[in-house]
């Protein structure tokens, strides 16, 4: 195997994401003519501690959301340093960009610029070596197909309705394989559409492909999903489980949680009890961002109440950042981390966060963003690191389906070597 393959060109362009906003795409070319291409996603509900996504701010172009500054940073500052480097040395590539940026939050070059380059380098390296991306990142041990955490009802910032909680998801942890899990979710998705239609609800979809009906309450969203699971011929709590992403930072005001759609304002203790009641009533296996990103006391209360039986995922809380994750581990809050590549800005730092989580007994859920592209890197990443869970939207909208289709290809390639862990993927809770 080659041990040095020189980077000869690094080039970025501005493209569009699934929300019709500009984003960065990067091409990295190697001395043997091989090319790696990566496109960067973007979030709607972003954590305050995420790495900076560099936008132009010119209101006359794309309402100020252009990324030409980030593109220029790739084509000049970053390219000047990386051309001539060994594409196989991912750590050195990412370290070089981090040092070039020189800030704690990627504010100078932009996490969108740096991530595009980081991922394009990994893809170019894999292509040059004739390997799949998951094999290149994970080596011989990358073989676990993930349980999908599939968003099928949208609320909060992802939809224009009166549902406060942002995402209501299904997890087919009872499926025997990834392909069967995908089939089950697809059937529930269709059953949900017909259920909503029969009840007179709109079946338009939100940013991530989930339906966005104007339901009467958050609990009604769970009820119609349970109904759809049964209608599709599956058993809630055995075949398919429920997962929630309240995105609580978005409803946290003056130390309390404002459930405006239900006309209630709750203290952190009351909010924790709200989740306890839901988890006792319904087969809820995972809750993401149940408390706000700076409500560490609220997180502690929630973790003490149900952290032994419900996966509690930190997204805005941890932002794929080892410093914040380390604090959470020391305080004993949450038991899982959501992994979003663009929250931290390089592949190396992402892998470090996953490793830290797993060493502490926390699960890692690899995730998309609401503003996505056709890029399928996260599908390869989740298999490479054996994370066992992926969150990448409904089985609708091609930028979501692209990830699922890539996982089907990987499952086929792995054949008997592949493993779908189902409930065993939740090693952080008592099942």
UniProtKB/Swiss-Prot annotation:
Protein name (record): Enolase
PROSITE patterns from the UniProt entry: ENOLASE (PS00164)
Alphabetical UniProt keywords: Cytoplasm, Glycolysis, Lyase, Magnesium, Metal-binding, Secreted
Catalytic activity: (2R)-2-phosphoglycerate = phosphoenolpyruvate + H2O
Cofactor binding note of this UniProt entry: Binds a second Mg(2+) ion via substrate during catalysis.
Function, in words: Catalyzes the reversible conversion of 2-phosphoglycerate (2-PG) into phosphoenolpyruvate (PEP). It is essential for the degradation of carbohydrates via glycolysis.
Family classification: Belongs to the enolase family.
Predominant cellular place of this UniProt entry's protein: cytoplasm
Top class in the EC scheme: lyase
Taxonomic source organism: Clostridium botulinum (strain Kyoto / Type A2)
EC nos: 4.2.1.11
Gene Ontology terms, MF aspect: magnesium ion binding; phosphopyruvate hydratase activity
Active site: 208, 340
UniProt record, GO biological process: glycolytic process
Top-rank taxon: Bacteria
